[in-house]
Structures are given as structure tokens and as C-alpha cells.
Amino acid sequence: MKNSLWLYKNPYQIEIRENEAHPPQVAVYLYQAEEEIKNVVLIGGGSVSSLWEKSALLDGDRLLIACGNEVFCILLPTLELLWHTQVDMATCFQIVAYQDDYITHGELEIVRLNKQGEILWQFSGKDIFVSPIERTPAFKITPQGIDLVDFNYE
């Protein structure tokens, strides 16, 4: 497990680690005063995507994590699983807060979830939502809506 993401919610430190030996799987470690107090392993379905800063979202006492093709919502500091929802056929790259809900950017789908993990709407394109050019974001929320770029720039 070499890829880690750290988040901070006073008085806790949260480490999310990719388990490269068993993808898509992440371990969540909760620390207080640099001592581990709890941990949990989350196992998603679908394909693997690397852990990065937008793979997790702190929302009050909730931690949302994109793992494989699912989003998991766990309660802090108990690490109790509140819900998990499949948001893409393949993999979920990121989750962002939007109004009182969440928007996920998957390889094949964009999904809006409510706070209970229920899908409010979803959108699929003709191709995968990734940009072949690094400088061009494939997914961007604007005041007018969501800008998307697929692999064919459509």
C-alpha cells in the first residue's frame, strides 16, 4: 500500500490507503494525537482508479470515498458505514459537494447523489469522460452547469 491520502478533521487525522495487492480496495485509518484509534477496509466493485485528492470528501461528520465504481459514506469518528452506492459501470474518479448533494465523475457516468446515497439523476456520454490532454479538464462544475470532455473532445 503505497498510495495514501491524508485528511484532517479536528481532533482527528484520517489516512486513506490504496491496497494495490487487492484493488479496488482502500483502508481508512483514524488517528488521534498520532495514535491509530480505528480502521476499516472498503472493497469496491468495477475497475481500479488511483487514489487522489478528489477521491475523498469530508462533509461534516461524514467521509465519502470513491473506491472502484462505488461511493462509500462513513460516519466519523465511529467509521460506521452509512451507505454505499454504485455510481459507474467501470470506476469513479471523484466526488464533489454540489448544493445539498454530491456529484460524482466516473469513467462512463456523471451521477448526482443525495445525502442518503440515492441516485437523483445520471448522465452517460458517447465515450469515456477523460481528457487525452492533461491541461484540459474532463470534468468541471461551473455556475451554468457541468462542463464535460470525453476522449473524443465531444
Language-model features, listed with the residues they occupy:
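Repeated scaffold domains used in trafficking and secretory/extracellular systems
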Residues: 1-18, 46-60, 86-99, 125-142
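Sequence/structural signature of beta-propeller modules
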Residues: 1-47, 150-154
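Short beta-strand elements that form the blades of beta-propeller/WD-repeat-like
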Residues: 11-27, 56-67, 72, 98-106, ...
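Aromatic (tryptophan-biased) beta-strands that constitute blades/sheets of beta-rich domains
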Residues: 29, 35-48, 81-86, 91, ...
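Generic "edge-of-domain/loop-turn" microfeature
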Residues: 35, 78, 90-92, 102, ...
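A glycine-rich, hydrophobic loop/mini-helix early in the fold
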Residues: 37-83
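Short loop/turn segments that connect beta-strands within beta-propeller blades
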Residues: 76-78, 114-118
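Short acidic/polar capping segments at secondary-structure boundaries
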Residues: 108-110, 117, 126-129, 145
